[in-house]
């Protein structure tokens, strides 16, 4: 299992556009990828799961990946979050 934690810095939080980009990126990997925030967790490959979590600015999130390509998935998702300005690099 691989994971990383970060604070959401986007002024509107984890909203529809970046959630869609993250779900698309996560879907490229065979690992199970979970986002955890505010004692809730969701499947990062599902935009609806991510949106239902209503993650706001300043929220600490953890992304976990479990599977054969977990390390690669975590690296790609972290970079995607930086590129979409959800978190700071």
Curated annotation (Swiss-Prot):
Phosphorylation on Ser-46 inhibits the phosphoryl transfer from enzyme I to HPr. This is Phosphocarrier protein HPr. GO terms for biological process: phosphoenolpyruvate-dependent sugar phosphotransferase system. Keywords: Cytoplasm, Phosphoprotein, Phosphotransferase system, Sugar transport, Transcription, Transcription regulation, Transport. It comes from the Bacteria. General (non sugar-specific) component of the phosphoenolpyruvate-dependent sugar phosphotransferase system (sugar PTS). This major carbohydrate active-transport system catalyzes the phosphorylation of incoming sugar substrates concomitantly with their translocation across the cell membrane. The phosphoryl group from phosphoenolpyruvate (PEP) is transferred to the phosphoryl carrier protein HPr by enzyme I. Phospho-HPr then transfers it to the PTS EIIA domain. Belongs to the HPr family. The modification Phosphoserine is found at residue 46. Residues 2-89 form the HPr domain. The active site is at 15 (pros-phosphohistidine intermediate). InterPro entries: HPr, HPr-like, HPr-like_sf, PTS_HPr_His_P_site, PTS_HPr_Ser_P_site. One of its GO terms (cellular component) is cytoplasm. It is found in: Cytoplasm.
């Amino acid at each position: 299992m691989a994971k990383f934690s970060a604070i959401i810095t986007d002024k509107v939080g984890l909203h529809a556009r970046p959630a869609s980009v993250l779900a698309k990126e996560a879907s490229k990997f065979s690992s199970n990828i979970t986002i955890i925030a505010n004692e809730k967790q969701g499947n990062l490959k599902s935009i609806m799961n991510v949106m239902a979590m209503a993650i706001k600015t300043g929220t600490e999130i953890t992304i976990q990946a479990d599977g054969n390509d977990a390390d690669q998935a975590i690296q790609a998702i972290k970079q995607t979050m930086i590129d979409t300005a959800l978190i700071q690099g």
